[in-house]
Amino acid sequence: MIKLVILWTKVIVLALIALLFSSCNGNVEFGNGIDGNGNVKTENRTPAEKFTKIENSRGLALTVEQSSAISVEVEADENLLKHIIIKVDNGTLVVTTDEDMDDYTTRKVTVKMPVIEKLSVDSGASIATVNTLTGASLKLHSDSGSELIVKAEYDAIDADCSSGSLQKLSGKSLKLTLQADSGSNLEAKKLLSNAVIATSSSGSSVSVHPLVSLNANASSGASIDYVNEPKQIKKDESSGGSINKS
């Protein structure tokens, strides 16, 4: 009975991932969106309002650099620039589009900011850090086939990853809290952390590098791998979940 449940879980997760990736906006011709004209231009979109968080969506590629200077630049086909929306909402820099875009040369957003408290990405979009981010507390969120690549050194890092999305984390932290579900992949084996709390479910995979303690919970065909044996470890495996040293 358990094997049957695991099998159906994996089938559902794979179907979900296929649906998500087929619906993500990318450099693919679907026929319903706007085509770029091939004439690439760059615009300065630095807002007047302050922000410490970023939310990126709808297939856009964004890089973020921690810097004393504040700037936002958008590079894209000239006729697509007006459809790339940059605004600040309650301290969050929101990056999105108001139209679907099919065939284009590039759609890049470059952000520089001094304080970074949260990075969020969904709907096939991506965020990558240029340098090592530092601070007290950092929240990371990825969803719906998106990608988040972050190098950071914070006291506390809290990351959640779902619906076929991918996170690759590196750096250092005192406390690391991770949650992955619905066929997502959270790679944090290059992020050294004193205390790690990791939860993985529904066919997801998590990798970690705990130094002092690890509290791990894996269920429904999901896995958690740890690359270092911590001084304290607590494992909770259920419904085909696995927790192993790699």
Task: Name what the model sees in each region.
Residues M1-D181, N185-S246:
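Intrinsically disordered, low-complexity terminal regions
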